[in-house]
Regions:
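Proline-enriched interdomain boundary motifs that mark the N-terminal boundary
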Residues: 1, 111-118, 224-230
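Short intrinsically disordered, low-complexity coil segments enriched in acidic
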Residues: 1-8, 227, 251-254
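Short helix- or helix-capping micro-motifs
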Residues: 37
Length: 254
């Protein structure tokens, strides 16, 4: 029996040293039939020259030396004792009596997180405070969002971190977002769907996402109070004066 170690998401190429072989008559493996697969893998793919190996298939020593026998774990699969198969060896005359087991451990590698687009809704004339849930984040290892990096800036309102303007390429930590330090404020009396946006990548503590996502900001309108202004009108002695609406100073941004 033997154990080999593969790497997550990477084909493992077997060598003859991976297969336990001993023969009192010879010191090296022969150049003809080397072994027979007696039980198959159950999780990944065992392939010979790109074709899945079948139960009872003979595999030559030359094929192994040529690097044609490979094992590929399932996407994102890893773990100790991840998979195994059994085999007999052949000295050119006869097979071994008892099959041996080749166990395959798969070492985990960090998978890049994924950033996803999102839309948040702010209120006119009010600062929007971002929370972690606003930033689309997925990770196959179920790691948590550790930071974002701003890759393109907004164009209309103001994006601030602790009161200072955010710059392109700036990394903003999970703790800053959780503390409510990242805010967006629309221009005064401004509103609308798709009012502004910025792009960002996400980080799982090891690596950034490969592509950016877009944070779109809608701004809901609120009624602005009207304003009155002083005015003077001129009446005529002994004559009733009739007011019109134009006589009353009135302004409303809405």
């Amino acid at each position: 029996d033997n154990t080999v170690t593969a790497t997550e998401d990477t084909p493992f190429v077997f060598t003859d040293a991976d297969f336990g072989f001993a023969d009192v008559d010879v010191t090296t493996q022969p150049e003809d039939t080397f072994g027979t697969v007696t039980t198959l893998v159950s999780t990944g793919k065992l392939e010979l020259n790109g074709v899945e190996v079948t139960l009872g298939q003979n595999i030559s020593h030359d094929d192994i030396l040529a690097g044609l026998l490979t094992f590929t774990p399932l996407k994102d699969g890893n773990g100790v004792g991840y998979d195994s198969f059994q085999f007999t060896v052949n000295d050119g005359i006869a097979d071994s009596l008892v099959p041996s087991t080749l166990t395959i451990d798969v070492t985990a590698v960090n998978d890049l997180p994924t950033a996803t687009d999102n839309t948040v809704t702010a209120t006119e004339d009010t600062a929007l405070v971002f929370v972690l849930a606003d930033f689309g984040f997925t990770d196959v290892e179920t790691d948590q969002l550790q930071s974002i990096t701003v890759t393109t800036l907004n164009s209309t309102g103001t994006l601030l971190l602790d009161g200072s303007a955010v710059t392109i390429g700036q990394t903003i930590s999970q703790s800053d977002i959780s503390a409510g330090a990242l805010t967006f404020t629309p221009l005064a009396n401004d509103n609308g769907a798709g009012y502004d946006s910025f792009a960002y990548t996400v980080n799982d503590g090891v690596a950034d996402s490969l592509t950016s996502a877009t944070m779109t900001i809608d701004v809901t309108a609120v009624n602005d109070l009207p304003t009155s202004s002083d005015n003077t009108v001129t009446a005529t002695e002994d004559t009733p004066f009739v007011f019109t609406d134009a006589d009353f100073g009135f302004a409303d941004v809405d």
